[in-house]
Regions:
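N-terminal periplasmic/intermembrane-space "pro-region" immediately following the signal or transit peptide
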Residues: 21-105
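Outer membrane beta-barrel
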Residues: 74-245, 261-266, 270-276, 308-323, ...
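Transmembrane beta-strand segments that form the barrel wall of outer-membrane beta-barrel proteins
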Residues: 144-155, 237-241, 282-292, 365-378, ...
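Detector for outer-membrane/organellar transmembrane beta-barrel domains
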Residues: 267-385
Length: 435
């Protein structure tokens, strides 16, 4: 900023000769204007200093508040320094349903009951799912820990005041670039897929009709191989704990001899090609274990094949096929039969299911699926099921990004040995709030 003396000197040097002829009053006017400008500049500087001090005070107050808030959060945490970040997820699901006379009084029958009962309708929230997801710390070798834990209220009874919490799926994944070790509870390794439904969530859709679904403890290894940018192989192997069940058609005196859980050994090899919108996956698999009952060993042997075919983003075809013997330990129907000679024989079974999905719009999708399990009649005791066939169709509409309405109609057609075919219709209207 120029002082008055400096300004006058510069003015004198820069003026031409005619200027010097100006009167003293003219020079005085210039000096007065310079005084005014200097005063205004000082005023501006004072205002700038005041604003700067104000900002410093505000920042200090903000930091104090943030530090106090951080201290409060630290006090509210109990040992969280060793825990993993947790995310709450799940689905609040309301179902209104209507059943036929052969539902067996179940909300979501998986087969048609042998004996008729009064048809009934109702509503329920017991298929609501609560979940926790976490992404954890780094592991040696560039790995990462993650996991999931899902529960529902399908245990207990259908009474609204007796819907008990239970574990559905719970896994811990130790992931590296091309390798994953998983420990927890999940579907069988050989049967990762299932139909899309909001009507049947408490148990997997098509249970006992081609879908091996039983959530059970297991340890699995997965190795990933890449053959190109969008082509590769997922090789999986592990130990799966079977849930052995005693058929109601068998002699009661042998029920106490059944070993309820057994180790099963499974493998699956998924070949894939394509991107998210256009993709094909096909995966053969195997399972073998042994059931101990009536002081005898009954082999369980299964071969499987599952697939996904998505030629465009609006169409999808998925499914599964299995063939083997003594498949009950994976959530299927009867596994063995005890003959009058006290010899135990495995029930030979074949099952399959398939689903077609059409994503008509961003909010609207249609799903049609069907499946069956066929047990060899010569292996089944009188009164047992030889064939259970279920087909269904549903439409789903997103009322909002996280609110889904759905309507589904299905029919179960169950054939009992020595009896007529039984039919049961099921209708379901669902509203799901996803979080």
């Amino acid at each position: 900023m120029l002082t008055k003396v400096t300004a006058v000197c510069l003015l004198a040097l820069g003026l031409s000769r005619p200027v010097f002829s100006q009167t003293n009053p003219d020079i005085q006017k210039v000096l007065d204007r310079l005084d005014t400008l200097e005063a205004e500049n000082r005023k501006l500087l004072d205002e700038i200093h005041e604003l700067r001090n104000e900002l410093i005070e505000r920042n200090t107050e903000g930091l104090d508040v943030q530090e106090n808030r951080t201290a409060e959060l630290d006090q509210s945490k109990v040992g969280t320094s060793q825990k993993l970040p947790i995310t709450l997820t799940g689905m609040l699901l309301f179902n209104a349903f209507d059943n036929g006379k052969h539902s067996g009084t179940a909300q979501d029958p998986t087969s048609a009951a042998l004996n008729a009962a009064p048809a009934f309708s109702g509503a329920s929230l017991r298929q609501t799912v609560l979940g926790l997801k976490f992404n954890g710390p780094d592991l040696p070798g560039g790995g990462k820990a993650s996991g999931q834990f899902y529960m529902d209220f399908f245990a207990g009874t259908s009474s609204p005041l007796n819907n008990l919490l239970r574990i559905r799926i719970a896994t811990v994944d130790l992931n590296w670039k091309n390798f994953t070790l998983t420990l927890g509870q999940d579907k069988p390794i050989i049967s990762p897929r299932e139909p899309t439904s909001l009507a049947q969530v408490g148990v997997s859709p098509l249970t006992g009709a081609g879908n091996l679904w039983d959530w059970a403890p297991q340890v699995r290894l997965q190795q990933r191989f890449s053959f190109g940018e969008n082509t590769g192989l997922l090789a999986q192997a592990g130990v799966y704990q079977t849930a052995e069940s005693y058929p109601g058609t068998q002699p009661v005196e042998y029920s106490g001899t059944l070993e309820r859980v057994r180790p099963g050994y499974q493998g699956r090899f998924e070949f894939f090609h394509g991107s998210e919108n256009r993709r094909i996956e096909i995966a053969p698999g195997f399972h073998f274990s042994t059931t101990h009952v009536a002081r005898q060993s009954v082999p369980s042997q299964i071969v499987s094949l599952d697939w996904l075919f998505r030629p465009t983003s609006v169409f999808e075809f998925t499914g599964e096929f299995f063939h083997g013997q003594n498949v009950a330990g994976l959530g299927a129907r009867q596994g063995f039969d005890i003959l009058p000679s006290e010899m135990v024989v495995p029930v030979h079974s074949q099952g399959e299911w398939a689903q077609i999905s059409v994503f008509a719009a961003a909010r609207l999708s249609f799903h049609a699926y069907a499946g069956e399990q066929h047990d060899r009649a010569s292996d089944v005791a009188p009164g047992g099921v030889t064939r259970n066939f279920v087909y269904a169709g549903n439409l789903m509409y997103k009322l909002a990004p996280n609110v889904v309405a759905a309507f589904e109609a299905s029919q179960a057609r169950t054939q009992y040995l020595g009896s007529l075919l039984r039919l049961n219709n099921h209708y379901d209207l669902a509203l799901a709030y996803l979080f």
